[in-house]
Amino acid sequence: MNVLIIGSGGREHALAWKVAQDPRVQKVFVAPGNAGTAIEAKCENVAIDVLALEQLADFAENNVSLTIVGPEVPLVAGVVDLFRSRGLDCFGPTAGAAQLEGSKAFTKDFLARHKIPTADYQNFTEIEPALAYLREKGAPIVIKADGLAAGKGVIVAMTLTEAEDAVQDMLAGNAFGEAGSRVVIEEFLDGEEASFIVMVDGKNVLPMATSQDHKRVGDGDSGPNTGGMGAYSPAPVVTADVHQRVMDLVIWPTVRGMADEGNVYTGFLYAGLMIDKAGNPKVIEFNCRFGDPETQPVMLRLQSSLVLLIEAALAQALDKVEAQWDPRPSLGIVLAAGGYPGDYAKGAIIEGLDAAALLEGKIFHAGTTLQDDRVVTSGGRVLCATALGDSVGSAQKNAYALAAKVDWQGCFYRTDIGYRAIARERGEDQE
């Protein structure tokens, strides 16, 4: 069989790499893909944009029996609806169900309706009421652009001035365009974050391995938010007890609530959670797809066939399958272009990929492209160096050894990915 994967990031390279390992799969097409998917065994790039929905459907109709959607933008635009209307198998939520990521206001209202734990909040489209609410609540407080903003439309304001500036920027200054014409202001939550990703077939749920992302650009979680600078799996904060609570309090009510409201959910569902000291989860956000960079360490640990699991999901038979995981932790470090998440240069030649390929682990490509057979940078997050280890500490050591082999002008990465889990392993107190 042939499979199409829509997207061009590190997540899509990891999905393509995993799908290609299934002996039944002859060819994995990636649209539009990157340099990594261009050179990956059994993989081939197709020059179709993620929003060229009709072209994607035409290609799928003629070439593949299954399509997997990586990024959120085509999901919110209705790629799954189009594929279904043409009788094509496509794994992901419909546009209606993808509102869980496409609109933060929709999500907060949905959570409130179904009594799913989340931060207290209000939605605003006008500046004055928003500022009045800020002054009433005080800082720290969180301001979110309502629509899709590539993971960057969230400001955690530690002072009232910072909060007021963020609201002004979004509602008046048009900082995030259409995405920021409505804002959600919510209480600041204390605790530890975890990424809880499951597969959903409309009624059954299959949890994936847990993970923890590192959103801030700098060491010690400093600097602005990014799409994610690294991740590891599993997340020790999600104990067996917390796992059960998340399923009972968050995942099941979400899947049933969406179905009750006429938006039956099929696809990957990613709950971004804050876990407090007592182990109580609250929903920070939903994503209607696998996380990036979480996909990379999670796929490294998945031993089952991803294709088999997705086929089960499309047949509403997720209750009949189990996912097998490598018991060892994995960790991925994002190598980014200097200046990210702000402006950055493109077109730098990446050195050392062949040397890195000789080490244990895997380098997944994100913002890369091929130019005259050389791999060059083409995005802010460029590569993700990912490795397994007997502990998070050893996975970290292996991943950094991999990252150290690679370089280009302006390359940078955080040096502390996994620090919370490693402190836990050493028995140090978590602050």
From Swiss-Prot:
Q: Which reaction does it catalyse?
A: 5-phospho-beta-D-ribosylamine + glycine + ATP = N(1)-(5-phospho-beta-D-ribosyl)glycinamide + ADP + phosphate + H(+)
- Tell me the pathway: Purine metabolism; IMP biosynthesis via de novo pathway; N(1)-(5-phospho-D-ribosyl)glycinamide from 5-phospho-alpha-D-ribose 1-diphosphate: step 2/2
Q: Which parts of the sequence bind Mg(2+)? A: E285, N287
Which cofactor names does the annotation list?
Mg(2+); Mn(2+)
Q: Which spans of this chain does the record mark as coiled coil? A: none
The family database entries (PANTHER family) matched by this protein are listed as: PHOSPHORIBOSYLAMINE--GLYCINE LIGASE, PHOSPHORIBOSYLAMINE--GLYCINE LIGASE, CHLOROPLASTIC
Q: What is this protein called?
A: Phosphoribosylamine--glycine ligase
